[in-house]
């Protein structure tokens, strides 16, 4: 039997602070692997507007800045730390981008690819070469970042594939989810999702030692409870409290029940950290507080077909 340890995290949504903590955790906990289940990228652009006098205007976290050109790199770092994407442009170009959805989406795509490449290039600086870094994008990640991950020599691309955790344990990865209110890049019907998952897990050699890294947690599992939304996508509030309900995927639950792997790694629902049991399968969700720069993760040790350690990690 092979014993291995890894840190699992998810839903860092462009937070460079969380990404650096994730990489640093490899040496802190002396693990054999890091596993990230999307959503990796940020979704908000902060324009840095060039003025005629050579200065630059920007608004960040409701605060206005006037920057010199030499101050832009440091300001950009500050913006990226909290999941936003800095972009230097002119007021005229910013107006054109705002009015053109196609141009806006292309810009998001390009900026996200730049950030992902930069992040992956930090791996050899932070992580021992013998520690595998397995990444499977999530529903909020644009498809364009996949090629960036595939081409990087420091990361293992897992999406819709089965990759080796070690010589005995395999990780089957699917980052797609069932439909959400946000029309994200990787979502589909429950029926299609089940077929996607089934196609991947059928490549697994040994279910007793397998790990399923499915971004969306099982439906109605206590690790999938999210605030309920009304038809205007506003939280439902009753008696002064938010109403919560299940928001996971029925396809995930069905696959877990049918195939019974050793472990299920999930995310997607930030508000529901914890772990549950489905038959012999332990399913966990670390949750996410990326906006506060808090890394939420699990330290996992497995030995053959047994889980020998399961510890919440936050920092």
List each language-model region with its residue ranges.
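Catalytic phosphate/metal-binding cores of nucleic-acid and nucleotide-processing enzymes, i.e., regions
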Residues: 16-23, 29, 46-47, 151, ...
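Active-site-proximal segments of metal-dependent phosphoesterases and phosphodiesterases across multiple
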Residues: 101-113, 211-260
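Core catalytic region of metal-dependent phosphoesterases/phosphodiesterases
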Residues: 18-166
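Binuclear metal-dependent phosphoesterase catalytic core
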Residues: 14, 162-168, 184, 188-189, ...
């Amino acid at each position: 039997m092979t014993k291995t340890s890894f840190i699992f995290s998810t839903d860092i949504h462009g937070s460079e602070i969380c990404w650096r903590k994730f990489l640093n955790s490899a040496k802190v906990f002396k693990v054999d692997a890091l596993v990230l289940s999307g959503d990796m990228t940020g979704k908000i652009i902060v324009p840095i507007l060039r003025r005629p006098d050579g200065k630059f205007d920007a608004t960040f976290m409701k605060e206005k800045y006037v920057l010199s050109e030499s101050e832009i790199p440091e300001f950009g770092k500050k913006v990226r730390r909290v999941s936003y994407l800095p972009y230097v442009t002119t007021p005229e170009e910013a107006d054109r981008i705002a009015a053109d959805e196609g141009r806006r989406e292309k810009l998001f795509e390009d900026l996200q690819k730049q950030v992902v490449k930069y992040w992956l290039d930090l791996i050899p600086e932070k992580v021992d070469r013998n520690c595998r870094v397995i990444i499977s994008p999530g529903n909020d990640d644009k498809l364009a970042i996949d090629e960036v991950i595939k081409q990087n020599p420091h990361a293992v691309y897992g999406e819709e594939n089965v990759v080796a955790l070690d010589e005995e344990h395999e990780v089957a990865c699917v980052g797609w989810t069932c439909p959400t209110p946000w029309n994200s890049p990787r979502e589909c019907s429950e029926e299609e999702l089940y077929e996607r998952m089934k196609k991947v897990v059928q490549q697994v050699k040994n279910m007793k030692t397998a790990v399923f890294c499915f971004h969306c947690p099982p439906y109605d599992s206590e690790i999938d409870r999210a605030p309920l939304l009304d038809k205007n996508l506003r939280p439902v509030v009753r008696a002064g409290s938010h109403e919560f309900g299940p928001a996971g995927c029925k396809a995930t639950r069905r696959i877990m029940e049918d195939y019974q792997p050793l472990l299920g790694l999930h995310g997607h629902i930030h508000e529901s950290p914890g772990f549950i049991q489905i038959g012999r399968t332990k399913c966990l969700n670390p949750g996410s507080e990326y906006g506060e720069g808090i890394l939420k993760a699990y330290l996992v040790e497995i030995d053959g077909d047994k889980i020998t350690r399961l510890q919440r990690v936050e920092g």
